[in-house]
Structure formats: structure tokens, C-alpha cells
Amino acid sequence: MHDKILILDFGSQVTQLIARRVREANVYSEIHPYDVDASFIRDFAPKGVILSGGPSSVTETDTPRVPQAVFELGVPVLGICYGMQAMAEQLGGKVDIGHLREFGYAEVRARNHTSLLEGIKDFTTPEGHGMLKVWMSHGDKVLEMPPGFALMASTESCPIAAMADEKRHFYGLQWHPEVTHTVQGRAMLERFVLQICGARADWEMGNYIDEAVAKIREQVGNEHVILGLSGGVDSSVAAALLHRAIGDQLTCVFVDHGLLRLNEAEQVMATFADHLGVKVIHVDASEVFLRKLAGVTDPEAKRKIIGAEFVEVFQAEAGRLTDAKWLAQGTIYPDVIESAGKGKKGAQTIKSHHNVGGLPETLNLKLLEPLRELFKDEVRELGVKLGLPPAMVYRHPFPGPGLGVRILGEVKRDFADLLRRADAIFIETLRTFIDKETGKSWYDLTSQAFAVFLPVKSVGVMGDGRTYEYVVALRAVQTLDFMTAHWAHLPHELLGHVSNRIINEVRGINRVVYDISGKPPATIEWE
């Protein structure tokens, strides 16, 4: 059994980053809503508890509070932003609405010698004060610390920026150690988890494979499992893990909706059927999907049609596998968190997980989610350890509706063919162009890159003739979390090379443009 850190979510947009940072220290962590009951907290038996930030104000009476059981467990507690304010208010301190709000970069002076911040600093002032570069995002602030607490850090506008009760191992930070802008944030969280909580650093993907395989075998027994294989990272890793556990008891259904990347169907079949020996049923449903999409231009309508048709095709194939008792899905931990948090007071409003839908009930199958405890980076690491090609495991995200939302307006087979080839040229070029400074390919230096088909024509000149052909836009972004993103400053030489190749090799396109919009205001995908 792994040591665990319990993270209570008060609605922060970056709560998932806390769990990721803890797991990066090789300690298992889980996120749960702030209002879980006392018996759950006791049964969870955490080595420590972290209270997340959130958008509410503890100065109001009906806003979230920390379960009293947290303070009675006898384990270390770390409150972050709202979590610190709630801790202060509930333990006898005072919190007030701040007249000077702090949003963004701040320099914090560490005070006193506390076990959480001892020896952690970014620079020292001429007066000899240790300083930290941190990220703040708060309006309210603690005016008076509860009994037993000592000042741990301060800023000019926030005299109590951090506090500590060393006897009970309760700590509060007004800044966010989980975001990369807080330079020493990782060191602070590792100090709390490993030294103060004393958690064992034994959460590793190598160990996870053995544990997951044993758990799947115990859960499934001799029964058969079906999995919808999309070719994406999550379903691919789920298939590899399940095959490792139950072999021929697994059958994958790969639905080709005609909106995949160039040669993607062949690559999926080669990897799973030929290389790994997984049983895969390949369904070419492209004609059906394209027929249903004819005349449809609204992006949301296209998504719904593709989603509904996928369910119908998958259901028809799965219905033929009469001995199957389980439906496996590539649900990962962020999907679980988002679905659980939906509708919770104080929580951010996020989509519910689209994978699950109503398929298990419709097919009268039991649901199997072997990756539901893992974050995306952990899923990728697991995939490599299971023998999947790194090029597949580490490739950029691809939307479920595929090229259907990268063809603006109506989806046509000709448009999909043009876009497929243009996109392949762009990706191939990103892989081959190496940045001299880092030694990495531009594909590895970007978080997501793709081509978009624009349903407009422009005048061009090729040879001695006039052309009137379509336009393709290129999009490449860099991001840590996909919540915000910067457009990638690709070398002009690379962009020129891509443009020349697309115009010369993809008949029907005579103009290539590059999208230099960030997120926000633009989204990463165009539709």
C-alpha cells in the first residue's frame, strides 16, 4: 500500500497541478471535493492533507469550509491561498477583504526558521533577508494568525503571506507553490510531502504495471473485455496494459471515421495487431460519417454527429461480441476529477468526461478504467514501459472528432484528403528541423501543432497560369497545461520550407498562412 496525500479541492483552476507536483515527488496523491465526510477522510488515512485555493471568500458565511476531521487527524496540513484563509478563520484567526489585491508575480520575504521554508530562497537582499519569487492570486488576506501560529513570510501588501504552527505541523501559504511561476514551489511541496509528512517516495510507473496487471486480472477473471481504440495516447496505453494483463481476453474495436491523420489507420493496425499481437477489429465507417456530415457547418453540430455516430458504429460491433462482459475505456485521472467536480459548489465548471457516455448501460457491460488513477504524463511514461513506440506515446493531442473540427465549415472527403497531406508535411518538417540552442526538434518544442483547412479560395500564380485554390492555416502552440498557450515562434526558414512543400506537393492549395493568436483570446483548435 502506497503512502497517500489527500488534496481537498475548493474550486481552484490549478488544483490538478498540486496533485501532479506531489506525484512528481513519487508520492501518490488524490484530489477530492472539500465537503467529503469525516469517515472518508479517516478511512483514506493520508500521511498529510493539502487544502487547495478557490474563488470563494471566507468572509462570507455560506462559502466552503475545511472538514473539522482534517485538523483532528494528527497529520500535517498545508493550506494554499483560500486553503490558508479557511484554516486561519476556522482555527481562531481573522481574515478580511483585502483592499490591495495581489495577482501575479510577487517577492516574498521569508521570516523565522520554519521546517517548511528553511534553506529555501531565490535570492538574498543586501540586508541579508532571504527572498522568494512567487505567484499570488488573492483578494482576501489573513489579518490575525490563530493561536499557536508564527509568521513564516510577508510582502509589503500582505504582512501575513505565510504562517506555521510547527507543533501541529499546520502551514499556510498565501501564494501558489504548485504553479511554475513560483520558482521554489516544487521544493516547498517536496519538503512538505517527503520530510514533514514523511511519505514514502514509492509511486513509480514500473511498480504500477505489476499492481495494475494484478488488479485487472482479479477484477476481470476469465471474462472478455472490449475497448474502443482511437489511436490516441489514452486508449492505446489502456489497450497495451489490458493486453499485458489478460491477453486474448481483450478485443479492440478501431472505428475509422475517415477523419484521421495520414496513414493513421495503418499505423494503429501495425502497432497493435502486428507488433503487440492485440485482437483488433478495424471498422471503416468513413462513408457513413461523411454522409451524415454533408451540409453541416456548425462546429458543435459536427461534434455531436461524429460522437453519436461513433457510439452507434461501436455499439453495432460490440453487440456482435456476445461473450464480452466488460467495456474498457481510456479514462484518465483529470477526467475523473472533472466529472466529480461538475456541479459542486465552489468548483470550476468543466465538461463532464465524454468517453463514458451511456455505452456501458446500453450494452449491459461492466465498466473497466485501468488508467483512471493516472495523469497524462504518467500515462505516457507507462506507455513507453509497456513497449509502445515513443513516437506514438509522445505525439501531440488530436481531437476526438479528428479532422472534422480542423476543416472549417462543411466536411468533404476532398477537403479531408487535402488537409491530411498538408498536415503530414507540417508535422514531418517540425520533426526534422532541429533547434540549435536546445538540440531538440521543433516538434518536441511545441505542445501541439496542426494544419487547418479554410473553405476560402485565393488567387495565385503558378508557372504562367492563374490559380484560384484553397488556403491552409498552420497552428503551433507552446503550453504547460493547455489552459493558456503562446503561439510558437517557429523559425522563418521552417515556415518557408513548409509553405513551399505544401503548395508544390498538395494540388488544390495555393496559399499557406500562420496563426499567431494566443490562448486567450483564441482557443487552440479553430473549432
Swiss-Prot record:
Keywords: ATP-binding, Glutamine amidotransferase, GMP biosynthesis, Ligase, Nucleotide-binding, Purine biosynthesis. Residues 4-202 form the Glutamine amidotransferase type-1 domain. GO terms for cellular component: cytosol. This is GMP synthase [glutamine-hydrolyzing]. It comes from Paraburkholderia phytofirmans (strain DSM 17436 / LMG 22146 / PsJN) (Burkholderia phytofirmans). The lineage of its organism: Bacteria, Pseudomonadati, Pseudomonadota, Betaproteobacteria, Burkholderiales. It comes from the Bacteria. Catalyzes the synthesis of GMP from XMP. SUPFAM superfamilies: Adenine nucleotide alpha hydrolases-like, Class I glutamine amidotransferase-like, GMP synthetase C-terminal dimerisation domain. It catalyses: XMP + L-glutamine + ATP + H2O = GMP + L-glutamate + AMP + diphosphate + 2 H(+). Homodimer. The active site is at 81 (nucleophile), 176, 178. Residues 203-395 form the GMPS ATP-PPase domain. It is an enzyme of class 6 (ligase). ATP binds at residues 230-236. HAMAP family: GMP_synthase. One of its GO terms (molecular function) is GMP synthase activity. The keyword Nucleotide-binding applies. Pathway: Purine metabolism; GMP biosynthesis; GMP from XMP (L-Gln route): step 1/1.
